[in-house]
Design a protein with these regions (language model features):
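Pyridoxal 5′-phosphate
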Residues: 1-254
């Protein structure tokens, strides 16, 4: 039995789990978690923000009750996003805010809500952001998520091979089928912020710090890491640029 299912208690109302770690790139077996939770009648919310851009997503195969994505990680506008809600859960849920279009009838004493999903669409939505997200999703669909995954898997394997050749770099998260995310630290006292500054001077953008995951950093015994995240537009040649920049950083800092 997977660990989150073992943790279910009589008072457990919801399991929330990430599909893909934004730090390690590790893919979580969310289908197994959903199957186990279902035997206890506990709904599962899957955070697919980091996963949805890297692979095809099938919520029926996953078996989740909720699946959330953020637009800016799908090459859409910031402030946009979407959530899948299973029909059974949608029928159980009450509106969490009020506004236009979510009410069928209202008097001074009573209110009748529209049927789902409209009863959750209160007020004026982010029209521009939603249109922008739709365009981004059309673009991704046109490319084909399976094609994107194949390209990224090849790029991941090449990046792993190149990084493995740097014996002074430690990569966190080493599962073979991880997403195209590499968080790493450098031997000695080289801090992630210093490394990222040198990489920036060479035209390589990485994120340095705790990546909004303080508990994970504490578990790993680290104060910070650099994170290189590749996407559908990256190439093997750009991986080589990263490696060259890391070698320069190592020469300067270690």
């Amino acid at each position: 039995m997977v660990r989150p299912v073992k943790a279910i208690k009589p008072r457990t109302k919801l399991i929330a789990v990430t599909h893909c770690s934004n730090v390690l790139g590790t893919l979580v077996d969310v289908a197994a978690i959903c199957a186990g939770a279902r035997t206890y009648g506990v709904p599962v919310l899957v955070d697919g923000s980091q996963a949805a851009i890297h692979m095809p997503i099938n919520v029926e195969q996953i078996g989740c009750d909720f699946y959330a994505v953020t637009g800016h990680k799908l090459y859409g506008p910031s402030g946009s996003g979407a959530i899948y809600v299973h029909q059974d859960r949608m029928a159980e849920m009450r509106p969490f805010m009020g506004g236009g279009d979510m009410i069928r009838e209202v008097t001074r004493d009573t209110v009748i809500y529209n049927a789902a999903p409209m009863k959750f669409e209160a007020g004026t939505p982010g029209i521009v952001q939603t249109i922008g997200l739709g365009v981004a999703l059309d673009y991704l669909t046109g490319l084909g998520m399976a094609n994107i995954a194949a390209h990224e898997n090849q790029l991941r394997d090449y990046a792993r091979k190149r990084l493995d050749g740097l014996n002074w770099i430690t990569v966190q998260g080493t599962t073979p089928d991880k997403a195209l995310i590499f968080s790493f630290s450098m031997e000695g006292a080289a801090h992630a912020h210093d490394i990222s500054t040198i990489l920036d001077k060479k035209g390589v953008a990485v994120r340095a710090g705790q990546h909004c995951t303080g508990p994970l950093m504490a578990h790993l015994g680290l104060n910070a890491t650099c994170r290189a995240s590749f996407g559908l537009y990256n190439t093997n040649a750009e991986v080589d640029v990263l490696i060259d920049a890391l070698e320069l950083a190592h020469d300067l800092l270690c």
